[in-house]
Amino acid sequence: GLGDVYKRQIDHYGGKDTRVFREVTETGEALLDLAQIAGSTTKAQAAILHDCESRWAMEDAQGPRNMGLQYMNTVKKVYGGLRKLGVNVDFLDMEENLSDYRIVFAPMLYLFRAGIEEKIRKFVADGGTFVMTYWSGVVDENDLCFLGGTPHGLMDVFGLRSTELDALYDQDVNAGVGEGKTYEIRNFCDLVKTNGAETLLAYRDDFYAGYPALTKNVFGEGEAYYVCADFEQAFYLSLIHI
């Protein structure tokens, strides 16, 4: 048919004085100029810890919200914030190496596998930036609660201790405020007691108005941020700029 007549040639004329010939030639020259990047890769500078066993443990916990833990939405907000800023992202589980990255996010890392706290500690001490959210480091790999405070094994790294987690009704809204900025909060509000961490944002409403909603702690050569609440997407765009 007609497809066989036209599909495999530049044209039927055979000369060099046509627009199509010139454009095909220019395309070939451009591809030669790009030969040096053939096979090259772009190394991600950021990573997100996303662990299926931790998610399963959260879903099996039957709380603190019986409906709507919003775990995957939280992961998507972190990822979306990074990608909107043009940052390449790798997804890791807790068995993988962190040292290849400049910044690592751990959204709702409820379950800590053995050794992850030491891995995070070393990453921050060696100069990395680690961002952890509320409801992290609560149970071990056997789904048994840690004793002594959360986030388990990292309270000195983050310069704080989580004291309680408030679960909001669907219609409830709080906010994190600071430095002239306000970010909407829904679903979860972690109440923390700081021990060296700097408060960057504070809760606006409820009995914990003024409590930290976002903190930063310098540990070794690096920095550890603790996101105390379920913030809106715009918060993560701002956080990555901090």
Predicted feature locations:
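Carbohydrate-binding surfaces of carbohydrate-active enzymes
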Residues: 1-241
